[in-house]
A protein has these predicted regions:
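A surface/extracellular/periplasmic glyco- and lipid-processing/surface-interacting theme
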Residues: 27-71, 75, 80-347
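Sec-dependent N-terminal signal peptides of Gram-positive bacterial secreted proteins and lipoproteins
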Residues: 2-25
């Protein structure tokens, strides 16, 4: 009987050892690594962190910018004088120098709201302030908090209005102190794919190695495809768009571009944007562009982007620039030289 008990204990021990070692088999390790590799990199989908939407100055005298490569989503939109401004969205990764920061304009509020973001600006037009108050937007204003949640970089050889910056730690401190919620249940604006999307096989695909997006005589934005790294190198008005801190040229994984009507409403040339409605545009990634549609039904409603077959677009894993152009400005999407005659678009 004792002999049988010993055999029974021995068998059970072997089975337990085998079971404990199951997860350490080479095949299982590979599967775990593959599973981890499929995790979305541009944002952490497992968290419900609320974004910050920061107004960025794009007057040429304010170049270079700081911190924009860590923005997962950027909008570029026309303002008065043919100058553009950016709205840079930060979520999981917020750098310690962002800027330079500029004042608010009314239609930028729409894009902060569609992302359920805390709005960050340094001053604003009277119309923008009126809307911020009436819409009860959570916002952090450099006019109120210079020296506390915003700072001046006086080492820069720039006009004073181009020297305003903030940093991630300051924004988080401000949000807590001002009692803003720091999580969001609204979800991301855009849908992303952990698997690489090949746009070349889609209907209407254009080769897209070089992209020219005209805003005015003052401002043109260009992208050039880097096939080795599968990103677009960003330039503006003939100059590489570089970072003040790193010196590196900014890149984009995804580009969405479309056109809306704009008009001046005051003697300063401040703009109104006819951005509630629908229209057509392009989604560009990995060297190709495909035609899409866009629709925004209210100021706080999310803009919905769809392929021509009616399916919502999915983006490659990486940062995105949304280029909202004035109507009737040049949009040129060009392929490599041998295909350039067939693969260009001008609107």
């Amino acid at each position: 009987m004792k002999y049988l008990k010993k055999i029974f204990v021995l068998v059970i021990s072997v089975l337990l050892i085998a079971g404990c070692g199951k997860d350490k088999l080479p095949g299982n390790d590979k599967r775990e690594k593959d599973k981890e590799a499929k995790k979305l990199q541009i944002v952490d989908e497992s968290k419900d962190t609320r974004s910050y939407a920061v107004m960025i100055n794009n007057n040429h005298q304010a170049w270079p910018h700081a911190g924009l490569q860590e923005s997962y989503l950027n909008y570029e939109i026309i303002t008065e004088g043919g100058i553009t401004r950016f709205l840079a969205l930060f979520r999981d990764s917020i750098p310690e120098k962002i800027g330079s920061i500029r004042s608010s304009r009314i239609y930028f509020l729409d894009y902060a709201m569609e992302n359920d973001a805390i709005y960050v600006h340094w001053g604003g037009s009277k119309e923008a302030y009126s809307d911020i108050n009436s819409l009860k937007l959570d916002h952090i204003d450099g006019m109120d908090y210079e020296g506390k949640y915003f700072f001046r970089d006086k080492t820069l050889n720039r006009a004073y209005e181009h020297t305003g910056f903030t940093k991630g730690s300051m924004l988080k401190e401000a949000a807590t102190a001002l009692g803003f919620k720091t999580t969001s249940d609204k979800g991301l604006l855009l849908n992303y794919s952990v698997d690489e999307i090949d746009l070349s096989k889609m209907d209407g695909a254009l080769k897209a190695d070089d992209i020219e997006i005209e805003y005015s005589n003052y401002q043109t934005t260009n992208y050039k495809y880097d096939s080795e790294n599968k990103v677009y190198l960003r330039s503006m008005s003939g100059e590489a768009h570089t970072d003040l801190v790193t010196g590196k040229q900014y890149t984009a994984k995804n580009i969405i571009t479309y056109q809306v009507k704009n008009s001046s409403y005051d003697s300063y040339g401040r703009q109104e944007l006819d951005n509630i409605g629908s229209g057509e545009g392009y989604y560009i990634s990995n060297g190709y562009a495909v035609p899409i549609t866009w629709e925004k039904t209210c100021r706080s409603c999310k803009t919905v982007y769809k392929y021509k077959d009616g399916q919502e677009i999915k983006l490659n894993d990486g940062n995105t620039w949304i280029q909202i152009q004035p109507l009737n400005k040049v949009l040129d999407i060009t392929g490599n030289k041998e295909n350039s005659n067939n693969n260009s678009s001008e609107e």
